[in-house]
Amino acid sequence: QCADANVVITPSDQFVLNEEAFQHNIEEGFRFVEHHQALLTIGITPTRPEPGYGYIQMGDAMEGATEVFRVKSFTEKPDRDFAKVFMESGEFLWNTGLIQANGHYLNSCFRQLFPDVMKRLDAVRPNFTLEDELEFVSENYPSYANLSIDRGVLERCDEVCVMHGNFGWADLGTWHAIYECRSRGEGDNVVVDSEVILDESHNNVIKLPKGRLGIVSGLDGYIVAEEDNVLLICKKGDSSALVRKYVN
């Protein structure tokens, strides 16, 4: 409703290690989008060749802004070899999925990319209230194209920039991130709500169904997880690629 607002869009499954640095980056981002007609996303320096994340290639630096660059390319979930090349090049950042923009530019992007969606919104906009939101979404959302905000908006807008964030970040949608973010117990294992007997096992992530007893012996750096009668046992670094290969 407020065209002059500056907006931040954030995924819900993210882990921020340094809240103060995160707040500083968001405030810097708001200052940038207030004076630039562009979408701004935030990227993080890769610490490993993670095939489960998206990557952003940095282009030219933006004048008058600290650690902000034009986006040269997006790559979604590359294989491990490409992820390693990206990390070693120094040109790529992990895509956090965080997006900032001013209301005017965001509105213009949506009108350019999704004219039918905006036409429906315009029809109800004068009297649209929060109480109407659920009804509107239930009636209209199923008919919209199945597009992620990355592919539907970020990769198609004319002006997209990336800020180099420094707040420490993990996407909790990967097993490796769960290992990094959860507290570790005996042998540096992360046992997630599971009953397990550990024998000479270290640096593993273990998640079993309630009522299932697991005995893990001689493993180092593995994922052992069961859900809906599917058992996954693999090295932590291979989990994202394997899940994508066999599940998707």
What are the residue ranges of the model-derived segments?
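Short coil/turn connectors at secondary-structure junctions
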Residues: 3-5, 12, 35-39, 51, ...
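Left-handed beta-helix
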Residues: 104-248
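Glycine-rich, flexible loop/turn motifs
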Residues: 40, 49-52, 67-71, 82-83, ...
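Short loop-to-beta-strand entry elements in the cores of soluble alpha/beta enzymes
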Residues: 90-103
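A short, charged helix-loop
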Residues: 59-93, 127-131
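Conserved beta-loop-beta/alpha segment of the NTase-like Rossmann-fold superfamily
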Residues: 1-61, 101, 108, 112-113
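Conserved hydrophobic/aromatic beta-strand scaffold that supports enzyme active sites
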Residues: 41, 55, 73, 98-100, ...
